[in-house]
Amino acid sequence: MSVNVDATSSSGASEVRHDWTLAEVNALFAMPFNDLLFKAQCVHRAHFDPNYVQVSTLLSIKTGACPEDCKYCPQSARYDTGLEKERLMEIEKVIQRAREAKAAGSTRFCMGAAWRNPKERDMPYVTDMVREVKKLGLETCMTLGMLTREQAIALQQAGLDYYNHNLDTSPEFYGDIITTRTYQDRLNTLDAVREAGMNVCSGGIVGMGETGSDRSGLLMQLANLEHQPESVPINMLVKVKGTPMENVEDLDYFEFIRTIAVARIMMPKSFVRLSAGREAMNEQMQAMCFMAGANSIFYGCKLLTTSNPETHEDVMLFKKLGINAKQTREYSDEAHQAALLDEIQTNEAPQAPEMFYDATQKKPETVNI
């Protein structure tokens, strides 16, 4: 069977498709590595400045005790990971973290709660969080679990810019990872978010023991949505002791980079976020991910409950690569550069209290918020 994968043809570099077949996606993954990266870079340059990366900060506003059974997640109440449970964070503390994120160069502030879905009693608090963070001039994103259409509308009316709800993996592999909510439940939440008028952030996790065809299936599901997600986080599994996935075999790093590249080709106008798992990646691998089309990262020492490179390490890597973080609307060029220089100069300073428990550490730690 002959499959056309020339994504850099005159139409391929600008066309957003919603009719990808599994054979086409598998063929992209099977390309010689250098050819695949070249195609992905060409598509990337057709739609984005290749030397700019969007920067977000992720804060856990409610940690642990989640009733779901996602096998990768240390926040599930079903697994003994030593994670300290935390109630919904006070709005004042959230706003302080948002100010710190903006000072470090983030343009988007993402707030995550370990819920199956938000309760109605929680909605006034989370909508107030959105309004207050928006006042700082930051874009806002939330991940709160499944949403009803009414909840999605309430978040949109509060000013929420993005809602994150990952598909995680292919429909075929999904049942091996999660049983407490269906794939269709996830798609229904994405529909509710889109119909409410918000931007969609949706991606998945690789390295959970899935096949190459499952990685193709995940990207096919995302790309073939009626409207492709504006933001596509690609996570490398962070194995946490106590979860069912603590001993899963590592994914080859080249396969991860291929996943970034194929996502870029299939979703040419989406921001592809290099997300969880970056702490285990050296600078050279991260640089290859940027070459493959990743153009968004999270700043900060934690992603919810797992480690992330320190902010100053990202600043130094950007400097080496000639990459500039996408600036907040209020930042002038001079102010932005001053913020980056200040970050470099203070990277030896004593660290502020941790926002999150590090679920990848062997010994439990106390969460200081």
UniProtKB/Swiss-Prot annotation:
The record's free-text note on cofactor binding: Binds 1 [4Fe-4S] cluster. The cluster is coordinated with 3 cysteines and an exchangeable S-adenosyl-L-methionine.
UniProt keyword Ribonucleoprotein present: no
GO molecular function list: 2 iron, 2 sulfur cluster binding; 4 iron, 4 sulfur cluster binding; biotin synthase activity; iron ion binding
Name of the protein: Biotin synthase
Residues binding [2Fe-2S] cluster: C110, C141, C201, R273
UniProt record similarity statement: Belongs to the radical SAM superfamily. Biotin synthase family.
Database matches in PROSITE patterns: RADICAL_SAM
Domain Radical SAM core as annotated: residue spans: 51-269
Gene3D superfamilies reported in the protein's UniProt record: Aldolase class I
Swiss-Prot/TrEMBL catalytic activity: (4R,5S)-dethiobiotin + (sulfur carrier)-SH + 2 reduced [2Fe-2S]-[ferredoxin] + 2 S-adenosyl-L-methionine = (sulfur carrier)-H + biotin + 2 5'-deoxyadenosine + 2 L-methionine + 2 oxidized [2Fe-2S]-[ferredoxin]
EC number: 2.8.1.6
Protein function: Catalyzes the conversion of dethiobiotin (DTB) to biotin by the insertion of a sulfur atom into dethiobiotin via a radical-based mechanism.
Enzyme class: transferase
Listed pathway(s): Cofactor biosynthesis; biotin biosynthesis; biotin from 7,8-diaminononanoate: step 2/2
SUPFAM superfamilies: Radical SAM enzymes
Residue sites binding [4Fe-4S] cluster per the record: C66, C70, C73
Keywords noted in UniProt: 2Fe-2S, 4Fe-4S, Biotin biosynthesis, Iron, Iron-sulfur, Metal-binding, S-adenosyl-L-methionine, Transferase
Gene: bioB
Taxonomic lineage of the native organism: Bacteria, Pseudomonadati, Pseudomonadota, Gammaproteobacteria, Alteromonadales
Highest taxon of source: Bacteria
SMART domains, sorted: BATS, Elp3
Cofactor: [4Fe-4S] cluster; [2Fe-2S] cluster
Subunit composition and interactions: Homodimer.
GO biological process: biotin biosynthetic process
